[in-house]
UniProtKB/Swiss-Prot annotation:
PANTHER family: PROPIONYL-COA CARBOXYLASE BETA CHAIN, PROPIONYL-COA CARBOXYLASE BETA CHAIN, MITOCHONDRIAL
Subunit structure: The biotin-dependent long-chain acyl-CoA carboxylase (LCC) complex is composed of AccA3, which contains the biotin carboxylase (BC) and biotin carboxyl carrier protein (BCCP) domains, and AccD4, which contains the carboxyl transferase (CT) domain. The complex also contains the beta5 subunit AccD5 and the epsilon subunit AccE5. The four subunits are essential for activity, but AccD5, together with AccE5, probably plays a structural role rather than a catalytic one.
Domain called CoA carboxyltransferase N-terminal: residue spans: 11-261
Source organism of this protein record: Mycobacterium tuberculosis (strain ATCC 25618 / H37Rv)
Keyword Transferase among UniProt keywords: yes
Induction: Expressed at higher levels during the exponential growth phase.
Family indicated by similarity: Belongs to the AccD/PCCB family.
Pfam families: Carboxyl_trans (PF01039)
Domain spans labelled CoA carboxyltransferase C-terminal: 270-503
Protein's recorded name: Biotin-dependent long chain acyl-coenzyme A carboxylase beta4 subunit
Length: 522
C-alpha cells in the first residue's frame, strides 16, 4: 500500500513540514538507537563535528538525503557531511553516524562523501573524515563496494592537492579502512579506535589463529605499524591534534601556510646558549633530540608526527621566523639514532608529504648509520633506505641540514647531505662525519691480530680510536672539502636557520627535466 503525501497549500504548512523533516533528520535512527548510543557514552555524528570545527561555523549539506525507492531508507544514510572552519580557514568534514545502518556505506552515503571531496578539490581546502563505521553495507551488495572504489579514486585525485585527514573513533573494519589509509594523517583514540581488514572471528575461521581485537587492530599496534600517525587519549585530544596539524599546513598545494608571530627573539637568548652544552662529551651517551628541537625553532613549538613508528627518526612541524618547516631529526635515545626500516619509511613519507605542500625541510643529524642485522635485510632495508634517498632528492623545497654529532655511512647521505641536493649544510664542532665510527673502524683493524684481546692489540686499538676521533671523524675535513658550508657555534643555530630560510624563500629549480614521474623503490 502506497502512502500518499498530503498536499500542502500554505507557506506555513510547508515551513512546518520542513521543520518536521529536519527534526527527524537530527536523529534518523530513532530514539532507541540514540539511547543506545548515549548509553555507550558516544557523541552523535554532528556533536563530533561541532567539537572539531570553529564554534558556529558548520554548514551541513545533504541532511535530507536518503536512498530513493527504499521504504526503510533513513535520512542522512549513515553519514553527516558539510563545510566548516578550522582556525578560521575552510574545511570539508564528514562524520559516520553509527545509529543509521551502523555507519556503513550505501548509495547516498557514497554520493554525499564523493560530492564533499569534489567540493574540497574545487575550493582548495582540507577534508577531515571522522570514522566510526562497520564497513560495507551488506544489504546494498556491490553498490557499497562500488562506492568504496569511487571514494578511493577521489582520494588519489585529492592526494598532494589538499590535506586529507582521518580520525578513527570506533571499530573500522574491511572497506572502512581503505579510505583512511589513503589520507595524509590518521589519528586514533586509544582503546576506542580500531583498524583491521578482517576481524578476529574471521581470522579464526580462515587461518585458525587466535588474536584479540586489541592485538589485531588496536590504535597503539597500528601506530607501531605506521598505519596510524598519532594516538591520543580522548576524542577532544584528537580534534585538538588535527587543529594543531592543520595550523602548520597550507589549505592546498598552491597556497602558503599561515605565518605566526614572525620576528620574535631576534637576538641570541639564554635558551640558545644552552645548546653549547647540550651534547654529551661521550659519543656513546644518549640525549633527547627534542631538547635541541625545542631550542632551535620558534616558541619551543614542535608538533610530532608519527611519533610511535620508526622512533629512531623524529618527524614533525615547527616554525622558523613564523613560517612552517618540516623537521627530520635522528633520535639518539632510540637505538642511538640508527636508521631502521620503519624509520626509513616514516622519513620518506613525511618528506614527500612536506614537499607536496611546498614546506621547507630541516634535517638535524646524529646517527651512527643504517641499523645492521639479518631481520633488517630480510625486511628490505636496501629498498626502504632507497625510498628515503629518493624522497630526499625528489624534494625540491628549501633544505637546510644541521649536523650535531654522528653522521656515518649511508645515513650521512640520506640525512640531507649536500650531494642529495641540500641547499645549506652546517655542522656543530661536536660533529663526527665519517664512513664509519671509530669503534667500527677499530673492529676492522682488530681482525688483523691473531688474538684481538691481547694487551698489545688492545693498546693499539685504544690508540687507533683516539687518533681516529681526533683526525678522521671530525667536521673540519668535510668543511675543507666543501661538503659542509660552515661549522658554527651551537647557540647560533636558531638565528642561522632564520637567515637561511630567508635566503631560500624564493628558491626555484630551472634545471628539472620534464617527465611524467620517476620510479620510487617499492
Amino acid at each position: 500500500m502506497t502512502v500518499t503525501e498530503p498536499v500542502l497549500h500554505t507557506t506555513a504548512e510547508k515551513l512546518a513540514e520542513l521543520r518536521e523533516r529536519l527534526e527527524l533528520a537530527k536523529e534518523p535512527g530513532g530514539e532507541k538507537a540514540a539511547a543506545k548510543r548515549d548509553k555507550k557514552g558516544i557523541p552523535s555524528a554532528r556533536a563530533r563535528i561541532y567539537e572539531l570545527v570553529d564554534p558556529g561555523s558548520f554548514m551541513e549539506i545533504g541532511a535530507l538525503c536518503r536512498t530513493p525507492g527504499d521504504p526503510n531508507a533513513l535520512y542522512g544514510d549513515g553519514v553527516v557531511t558539510g563545510h566548516g572552519l578550522i582556525n578560521g580557514r575552510p574545511v570539508g568534514v564528514f562524520s559516520h553516524d553509527q545509529t543509521v545502518f551502523g555507519g556503513t556505506v550505501g548509495e547516498m552515503f557514497g554520493r554525499k562523501v564523493a560530492r564533499l571531496m569534489e567540493w574540497c578539490a574545487m575550493v582548495g581546502c582540507p577534508i577531515v573524515g571522522i570514522n566510526d563505521s562497520g564497513g560495507a553495507r551488506i544489504q546494498d551488495a556491490v553498490t557499497s563496494l562500488a562506492w568504496y572504489a569511487e571514494l578511493g579514486r577521489r582520494h588519489e585525485l585529492l592526494s598532494g592537492l589538499v590535506p586529507q585527514i582521518s580520525i578513527i573513533l570506533g571499530k573500522c573494519a574491511g572497506g572502512a579502512v581503505y579510505s583512511p589509509i589513503q589520507t595524509d594523517l590518521v589519528v586514533a583514540v586509544r582503546d576506542q579506535g580500531y583498524m583491521f581488514v578482517t576481524g578476529p572471528d574471521v581470522i579464526k575461521d580462515v587461518t585458525g589463529e587466535d588474536v584479540s581485537l586489541d592485538e589485531l587492530g588496536g590504535a597503539d599496534h597500528q601506530a607501531s605499524y605506521g598505519n596510524i600517525h598519532q594516538v591520543v587519549e580522548s576524542e577532544a585530544a584528537a580534534y585538538q591534534y588535527v587543529r594543531d596539524f592543520l595550523s602548520f599546513l597550507p589549505s592546498n598545494c598552491f597556497d602558503k601556510p599561515p605565518v605566526v608571530n614572525p620576528g620574535l627573539e631576534p637576538e641570541i637568548t639564554g635558551h640558545d646558549l644552552e645548546l653549547d652544552s647540550i651534547v654529551p662529551d661521550s659519543d656513546n651517551m644518549a640525549y633527547d633530540m627534542h631538547e635541541v628541537l625545542l631550542r632551535i625553532f620558534d616558541d619551543g613549538d614542535f608538533l610530532d608526527v608519527a611519533a610511535q613508528a620508526g622512533q629512531a627518526i623524529i618527524t614533525g612541524y615547527a616554525r622558523v621566523d613564523g613560517r612552517t618547516v618540516g623537521v627530520v631529526a635522528n633520535q639518539p635515545m632510540h637505538m642511538s639514532g640508527a636508521i631502521d626500516n620503519e624509520a626509513s619509511d616514516k622519513a620518506a613519507r613525511f618528506i614527500r608529504f612536506s614537499d607536496a605542500f611546498d614546506i621547507p625541510l630541516v634535517f638535524v643529524v646524529d646517527t651512527p648509520g643504517f641499523l645492521p642485522g639479518v631481520e633488517q635485510e630480510k625486511n628490505g632495508i636496501i629498498k626502504r633506505g632507497g625510498r628515503f634517498l629518493y624522497a630526499v632528492v625528489e624534494a625540491d623545497v628549501p633544505k637546510v641540514t644541521i649536523t650535531i654529532r654522528k653522521s656515518y655511512g649511508g645515513a650521512y647521505a640520506v640525512m640531507g647531505s649536500k650531494q642529495l641536493t641540500a641547499d645549506l649544510n652546517f655542522a656543530w664542532p661536536t660533529a663526527r662525519i665519517a664512513v664509519i665510527g671509530a669503534d667500527g673502524a677499530a673492529q676492522l683493524l682488530m681482525k688483523r691480530f691473531p688474538d684481538p684481546n691481547a694487551p698489545e692489540a688492545q693498546a693499539i686499538r685504544k690508540s687507533f680510536v683516539e687518533n681516529y676521533n681526533l683526525n678522521m671523524a671530525i667536521p673540519w675535513i668535510a668543511a675543507e672539502r666543501g661538503f659542509i658550508d660552515a661549522v658554527i657555534d651551537p647557540h647560533e643555530t636558531r638565528l642561522l636557520l632564520r637567515k637561511s630560510m630567508h635566503l631560500l624563500r624564493d628558491k626555484q629549480l630551472w634545471w628539472r627535466v620534464g617527465r611524467k614521474h620517476g620510479l620510487i623503490p617499492v
